[in-house]
């Protein structure tokens, strides 16, 4: 089974690909989808969407796991990350694979 894990962000969206069976797990790939600070926000969201689609097409995950948002201080940042997370969830949903959400704790 191949699992794609996502740590949402709008500047950097982290990902990890793990292959697992009933006994062993192995890291296949990890990294970030990076957006340019100088780009308009809609273009940054598009870059995240296309990057997610590329990961999904390349690794064909069986399941996709998202870290839930955990913010207490900066409302603006939470809204921007929430938008990026929504775009990533949309990209994942389009591949018709099960989506799971986990807290960062």
Predicted regions and their residues:
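Phosphate- and other anionic-substrate recognition elements at nucleic-acid/protein interfaces
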Residues: 1-105
């Amino acid at each position: 089974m191949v699992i794609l894990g996502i740590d949402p962000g709008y500047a950097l969206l982290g990902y990890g690909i793990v292959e697992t069976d009933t006994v062993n797990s192995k890291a296949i790939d990890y990294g970030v989808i990076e957006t340019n600070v100088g780009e308009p926000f809609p273009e940054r969201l598009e870059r995240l969407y296309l990057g997610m689609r590329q990961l999904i097409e390349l690794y064909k995950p069986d399941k996709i796991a998202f870290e839930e948002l955990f913010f207490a201080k900066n409302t603006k940042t939470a809204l921007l990350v929430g938008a990026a997370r929504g775009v990533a969830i949309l990209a994942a949903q389009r591949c018709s694979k099960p989506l799971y959400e986990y807290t960062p704790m």
